Amino acid sequence: MNKTPTVLVIMDGFGMGNPGAGNAVSLANTPVLDRLFAENAHTTLSASGLDVGLPDGQMGNSEVGHTNIGGGRVVFQDLPRISRAIDSGEFFKNPAYNKAMDDCLQKGSSLHLYGLLSDGGVHSTVEHLWALLKMAKDKGLEKVYIHAFLDGRDVSPTSGKDFVAQCVEKCAEIGVGKIATVMGRYYAMDRDKRWERLQMAYDAMVYGEGVQNEDPVDAVAKSYENGVTDEFMEPVVCDSQGTISNNDSIIFFNYRPDRAREITRAIVDPEFDGFPREFFPTTYVCNTEYDASMPNVLVAWPRIAVKNGLGEYLSSLGMTQLRIAETEKYAHVTFFFNGGVETQYPGEDRVLVASPKVATYDLQPEMSACEVCDKCVERVRSGAYDVVILNFANCDMVGHTGVLEAAVKAVETVDACVGRVVDAALEMGGIAMITADHGNAEQMVQPDGSPMTAHTTNRVPFILCGAGTELREGRLADIAPTILDVMGLACPPEMDGKTLIVR
């Protein structure tokens, strides 16, 4: 007997902004979404700040968005959790940080601090780095090296020079620390097994290979002169004495796991085979749990479990569910949606479609959306699933390139695919919900006319197809309770989100 599916389509990076010359969403030709808005109940949801467990005014992101959607509650995020620990002093008592620094004192080895040098708040914040430098100074460490990964996606594409200059000033002010390498996140924070990129980052940090420039600020300036912005800056070695070596300690101060896993595994996992490298022991601290299977690491801030999220709860009821996305967002519909745990629940199937191997997604704004759509439609029509969770990555990943024309094409691609998925769900007598995890593509241009590559704090859409009803405004945490509501199921007590349906 075929199941009646409830399908949730997450249009990653599709926000609701003011129409205008820099809004790829309003510029795009979207006949499907236009029709769905006109014919179905719809509302908007908050996807940023306090409503998703972030500091007030902080833009949302994919990790946070999917965690809140899957959790059915506001999930307090790592950024404010760690920042509050700095304010309370708990940060400086952290056992993992202390172990890393004490090992340096005992062995006479170096401490390496690396991560995204940015205040974007998505993967990291510089305030946490400053606190680590202060802690190292207070403990009497002298050999402290910073490997600075430039952002250019969650902040302005040319803000890196100022962050590097600020870092140099902070090191002088605190009295410890020196930038050893500087490079774009494109190399150090890959998440799609593009080993040739990651090896360039590794070789710079471990072997001191790459462009040499003792002045990190000048190195960034020269990159700009060559037309290369922060994200794509090739690794530069600023201090040949600051390479990572045997028995050194490393603290990776990024708190978001997905782009921290590959470079971490290259350092700590003796079984890593992405590229040739020497394995040696280190005291390695992951700021949060990047991967439960990661060997030879300490975790500074273990994840707080999200009990009875949507996936776990559906499984406990004996229901079936499908998670489907392409590589760039696969972790989001699985790991993050399940509250940051690797568990694949009984009855939960997963489909991974490979993202295209292109340098940047403006070169192929369609990404793998059509293949994701094909596979999703096939699974929906199979009648095998009670719930389907689907992510289209285009609006976010292409939005991050800052190329408006490509972002318009990305929106149009998603529009066509959404129509096919919704049709399949309704043909099966099911329900379809369309939403987003945060904004991005609706604001592609800065007020000064330069490209905008970061997320936004704009609200996101929520459309309910196949159930004539009235909806209220809400937040991402309200989606799971709404799914359960249309399925005629009670919410578990751990969910504090509320159904969006007005009774």
Predicted feature locations:
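Feature captures the catalytic ectodomains and active-site-proximal regions of enzymes
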Residues: 1-503
